[in-house]
Amino acid sequence: ESGQGSINASVLMEGTFETPIYAGHASIKSGSLRLASIQEEIEDIQARLDISGRTVQISEGNARIGNGTVRLGGGIILIQDAPSQTNLQATFSSVRLRPNEDLDLTASGTLNLMGRVGSLELVGDVELLNLHYTSNIELDDMLRKKAKPLPLPGLSPGEAWSLRVNVRGENNLLFTNN
């Protein structure tokens, strides 16, 4: 995993360490990010974060993944001695993802991540413009009872994610296997 780009930030902290108040902004220009979880590089990252009091607002956020585009917006409220409150939106168009060699998909849609950290909800609509899955499906492996449940990374006891995402794909899903 790696990233690059030009980062400019100006942040002022007032008050005490127990009750700090922040003001300022941060921006990223000509950024790029490579994640181990997807083959595509996230490019042309342009973002501006405005910080006021205990609120971080994304006033501008754009990137390109493959030939597709992503727009980000929303904000986070930093709550003292409590989980932060999140309301983030992503709108994406013709984004191609290849999370592994067996799956290639292109999608458009809108996703919102809302709630307090530890109890987040992902809501939205995703249209699969095309999906091609090429891995062999072994029914014995799928139906065999697992000895223990699969672990969920990033969640502590008592934390949860709620998912309400509508996924639609009409006449463009291709499964090549067995």
Q: Residues of each region from the PLM?
A:
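Membrane-proximal interfacial segments on either side of biological membranes
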Residues: E1-Q57, G73-N178
